Amino acid sequence: MRTDWTREEIAALFDLPFDELMWEAQGVHRRHHARGEIQLCTLLSIKTGGCVEDCGYCSQSAHADTGLKATKLMDVRAVLQAAAQAKDAGSKRFCMGAAWRNPKDRDMPAIVEMIEGVRAMGMETCMTLGMLSKEQAQVLGMAGLDYYNHNIDTSPEHYGNVITTRSFQDRLDTLEEVRAAGINVCSGGIVGMGETRADRVGFIHTLATLPEHPGSVPINALVPVKGTVLGDMLADTPLAKIDDIEFVRTVAVARITMPKSMVRLSAGRESMSEATQALCFMAGANSIFTGDKLLTTANAGDNADAALFAKLGLRPMESEEPMRMEAAE
């Protein structure tokens, strides 16, 4: 797979006539993935709110005024019960997210128990816990964690307009620690945060030129939450939501430049029309989050997803054992 894409090449893809871009993306998708199969994932907040980071989009930031009450890390048994319910509902991957800048070492034993317990159910595991040290990444790798999510969020150029408490390089460093520990990388970002198309080019370029393409690439549409910096700033402006065609273009370019990655249609789907979601699937999105909630924001819901799948002739992807990366010596 190519990891030497240039920004000029990616910009040219964005500029293609829409039908040509969709044709190219669907062709790439069919060469590397089963047609009509969508991976179902569930995301659980195992520790909500109180995060010291100032991410402008996030209702869980301590800098936001959303009325969200911070919680402690969930009990392991409660997490495993939620995982069992997700499995019964058809999910193949269980993602666990904690609103931390980085995990404390004292929390790692419980995190390991969660990973081992979910894997014992036959589900893929994913964690998003913030930045990781080398030692913490190794602990997660030894526990058998399949994927670690750490989004780059946006382009390097736009990043400082969204977050100031963690650098773009900090994010890349964590991804490197994850790869070195033999864990598959899950990394994507958010569109509709006031960025330009050039920023969306830079966002895709960063992911597509990593040493290895992420195993999963979640693409989120900003959900403006009142009380967050971006929610208040963009709620009453045209920048609050990029148009649907531009969002689909972003999905298509991600598919073309990262052919084997799972491209996940993530936050913001609840407000998308069925037609827009259908175009995203045609453009190469082949993974979604199920359930009524994503961390603290609304999601489409299982009933709506089942109805949409029936209309489009889509089917849930059967679980496959993820390929384990080799840990660096």
UniProtKB/Swiss-Prot annotation:
* Cofactor: binding comment: Binds 1 [4Fe-4S] cluster. The cluster is coordinated with 3 cysteines and an exchangeable S-adenosyl-L-methionine. Binds 1 [2Fe-2S] cluster. The cluster is coordinated with 3 cysteines and 1 arginine.
* SMART domains for the chain: BATS (SM00876), Elp3 (SM00729)
Superkingdom of source: Bacteria
Question: Pathway it acts in?
Answer: Cofactor biosynthesis; biotin biosynthesis; biotin from 7,8-diaminononanoate: step 2/2
Q: Which PANTHER family match?
A: BIOTIN SYNTHASE, BIOTIN SYNTHASE, MITOCHONDRIAL
**Function as written in the Swiss-Prot or TrEMBL entry:** Catalyzes the conversion of dethiobiotin (DTB) to biotin by the insertion of a sulfur atom into dethiobiotin via a radical-based mechanism.
- Protein name per the record: Biotin synthase
Please report the organism this UniProt entry assigns to the protein. Answer: Sphingopyxis alaskensis (strain DSM 13593 / LMG 18877 / RB2256) (Sphingomonas alaskensis)
Q: Which gene encodes it?
A: bioB
